[in-house]
Regions:
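C-terminal helical subdomain
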Residues: 104-107, 112, 119, 126-127, ...
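Conserved amphipathic alpha-helix within the SDR
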Residues: 1-13
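Hydrophobic positions on the long internal alpha-helix
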Residues: 19, 55-59, 63, 109-110, ...
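Structured loop/turn residues at beta-strand edges in well-structured enzyme cores
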Residues: 10-13, 39, 120-122, 160
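Catalytic loop of short-chain dehydrogenase/reductase
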Residues: 24-25, 29-45, 64-118
Length: 176
């Protein structure tokens, strides 16, 4: 990570946009929280949260040099505590405890980083790409990769008066 930051600085001098796209599921969809191994929890958080934080910390000095830095943290609707707890929510019965918790942590990190950077031109937001046809999403997913990228592209190109510290999908705010 440090080497990448050094190379980016040497080549460009700054960084305008950071899109943190980290997502793994080790416990399997529909697994029980009480049976998810500590190893699965650790691996999930190592990739989905700690790697994201490490990359952000390494590249933040370059983002501070930008006139309009943007940080987009890829999350998931499965990280919404509001929707996970609502029996009427479409995701209520779709559980993967370590993955869902890691994405809730990403959302919390986005809020804290946005607060820290509120007096700078840097915007920080979480994005739910949707259920995308990828190796992780599978072929039954409802969105193409192009459509799945739309929220990230929108957040990466926000104007100066755009939102920060939010959670979005297709330009609509999602509940925490």
């Amino acid at each position: 990570i440090a080497q990448a930051a050094t190379q980016l600085e040497a080549r460009f001098g700054k960084l305008d946009t950071l899109i943190n796209n980290a997502g793994v599921v080790f416990e399997g969809w529909g697994s029980k929280a009480s049976e998810t191994t500590l190893d699965a929890w650790r691996k999930t958080f190592e990739t989905n949260v700690f790697a994201l934080v490490a990359v952000t910390q390494a590249l933040l000095p370059l983002l501070r040099k930008s006139d309009a830095g943007r940080i987009v943290n890829l999350s998931s609707i499965l990280g919404s505590l509001t929707l996970q707890a609502d029996p009427n929510s479409p995701i209520y019965n779709f559980k993967a405890a370590a993955y869902d918790s890691s994405k809730a942590a990403v959302n919390q990190y986005s809020i804290h980083l946005a607060h820290e950077l509120k007096d700078t031109p840097i915007k920080v937001n979480s994005a739910h790409p949707g259920w995308v046809k990828t190796d992780m999403g599978g072929q039954d997913a409802t969105m193409s990769v192009v459509d799945g990228a739309k929220t990230s592209v929108w957040l990466a190109t926000l104007p100066a008066d755009g939102p920060t510290g939010g959670f979005f999908h297709m330009q609509a705010a999602l509940p925490w």
